Amino acid sequence: MPQYRSRTTTYGRNMAGARALWRATGMKDEDFEKPIIAVANSFTQFVPGHVHLKDLGQLVAREIERAGGVAKEFNTIAVDDGIAMGHGGMLYSLPSRDLIADSVEYMVNAHCADALVCISNCDKITPGMLMAALRLNIPAVFVSGGPMEAGKVILNGEERHLDLVDAMVVAADDRESDEDVATIERSACPTCGSCSGMFTANSMNCLTEALGLSLPGNGSLLATHGDRKELFLEAGRLAVKLAKQYYEQDDESVLPRSIASFKAFENAICLDIAMGGSTNTVLHLLAAAHEAGVDFTMKDIDRLSRKIPNLCKVAPSTQKYHMEDVHRAGGVIAILGELDRAGLLHREVPTVHSPSLGAALDQWDINRETATEEAKSRYLAAPGGVPTQEAFSQSKRWTALDLDRENGCIRDIEHAYSQDGGLAVLYGNLAEQGCIVKTAGVDENILVFSGPAVVCESQDEAVNWILNGRVKEGDVVLIRYEGPRGGPGMQEMLYPTSYLKSKGLGKACALITDGRFSGGTSGLSIGHVSPEAAEGGLIALVEQGDRIEIDIPNRRIHLAVSEEELAHRRAAMEARGDQAWTPKDRDRPISQALQAYAAMTTSAARGGVRDLSQILGSR
């Protein structure tokens, strides 16, 4: 039977010094026999998704103590991708994921904590903490800060529901008045919480439910609603319970790696495909699987994407629905329930809160006769409609649940938005290791597309060309040297896609990059091209005007240039010597921190994880 890790610092005469320090934090004699639960918070005033978390760590801590544990809170960093977007700050976003994972590992292992509660929310914080939890493999529970309410505004006599992307698009549209732009800017992000659409943050928080590491409603219950408080309290109680199950009952089934198995990762990507989640989730799931020691790859994602339909369409793929609407329709559990009825889910996998996912569905799927009154009540939590930065500040409820699986926010298999899933992996000579497209956001008229390449050596160059009218209908904008190594940091391309929309080209052009896209991106936007340009990928050899062919139904992407010509171009590239596979005429200062990241990172096809052999082998 395993001993509490914390006894390393609390047991025996030789630990008198450590105990003296523990006492200085408030611990007493009786506490040294209890499990020490680390509360990894991520409060910051920089990020609306985290601005309300300041007191929530202590809320969880007090509940841990009531449940018989000792709580010790610490904080990680959190980058706001929306604020960091469109300038050099975005270079730091993906690298911050590794920094967050490392910081959680450092704190938990340095102090020998027994279990972990992860209070996350936004884009890189949830995946960073997820990587850490799977790396540490001690009992862990996730609880996120919750989604933001959708913005609401009256324009031209009509109510519009808004999010961050609307503000970006209208600001670049010369047809919009300054007054309307200002109105939308002030209304788009009305409350604390992660941005209100199915962007990266909300996608990842939904996936923690499918992986079995968070409670029902975690991905969709609004940050402002009083019902969300119970998720935080239950997370604290659950962490103590799981710690005692593992250390006192030798029950390894409660460990993160036992829960997040290969089958659980399959469930997670099936949810992702069904709900049309952010393409960034692919990057993060691959990285999490790597930490868990699970052999889950792009080929698995490709295989499942061919049989999972698109059952939920939310902003940015449509402005009709936001996360508050997903919640009213039953949230993640409802989507999983529809997949389960179609035989597309592994029901037997365990979760932190139920003996199996199947048992959880029976209790929490609001479209089942076995659904509890607690479940029906939880999913009635509605937006309050009052701007606020305060968690749990309102208690408004819908008058009825959205149980319509034919025309509602969440559909059943027979009435799917499309039988083709919301995410797809494309392969071809331009992406031999694969690339990702969010098909849920692609207009059906351009699922098959070809056009001349407009080659840009950076995101900045692409933005300049789009805004200055150099990109025309039918073009394929190609942005390269923005991958994990080439950027470095694999920037998001939300501004280029938003500006294409503002110019009326959102359904008339394609955009391809070895970088990535914001969860707020829609349109024919293909990212994660692997291998990236900096690794010798074919994307580095594309020239202006080359024809690029995209066929999403057949999962194909192809550069229509002869092998002989490509061989000639490759030889010319290699002849550049030390400058081979680097961008021409790009002046971008790179800090030592980012250089270190670039030296160790890998391709998007591997999740952009660290591979130390790349530097150890050079010694």
Swiss-Prot record:
An MF annotation (GO) of this entry: dihydroxy-acid dehydratase activity
Alphabetized InterPro entries for the sequence: Dihydro-acid_dehy_C, DihydroxyA_deHydtase, DiOHA_6PGluconate_deHydtase_CS, ILV_EDD_C, ILV_EDD_N, IlvD/EDD_N
Sequence positions that bind Mg(2+): D81, D123, K124, E492
This protein's name: Dihydroxy-acid dehydratase
Membership in a protein family: Belongs to the IlvD/Edd family.
The protein's enzyme class: lyase
Gene that encodes the chain: ilvD
Subunit structure and binding partners: Homodimer.
Functional pathway: Amino-acid biosynthesis; L-isoleucine biosynthesis; L-isoleucine from 2-oxobutanoate: step 3/4; Amino-acid biosynthesis; L-valine biosynthesis; L-valine from pyruvate: step 3/4
Cofactors required: [2Fe-2S] cluster; Mg(2+)
Biological function: Functions in the biosynthesis of branched-chain amino acids. Catalyzes the dehydration of (2R,3R)-2,3-dihydroxy-3-methylpentanoate (2,3-dihydroxy-3-methylvalerate) into 2-oxo-3-methylpentanoate (2-oxo-3-methylvalerate) and of (2R)-2,3-dihydroxy-3-methylbutanoate (2,3-dihydroxyisovalerate) into 2-oxo-3-methylbutanoate (2-oxoisovalerate), the penultimate precursor to L-isoleucine and L-valine, respectively.
UniProt-annotated catalytic positions: S518
PROSITE patterns in alphabetical order: ILVD_EDD_1 (PS00886), ILVD_EDD_2 (PS00887)
Annotated transmembrane regions: none
Cofactor binding: number and manner: Binds 1 [2Fe-2S] cluster per subunit. This cluster acts as a Lewis acid cofactor.
Annotated coiled-coil segments of the chain: none
Keywords, in A-Z order: 2Fe-2S, Amino-acid biosynthesis, Branched-chain amino acid biosynthesis, Iron, Iron-sulfur, Lyase, Magnesium, Metal-binding
GO cellular component terms attached to this protein's record: cytosol
Lineage, uppermost ranks: Bacteria, Bacillati, Cyanobacteriota, Cyanophyceae, Synechococcales
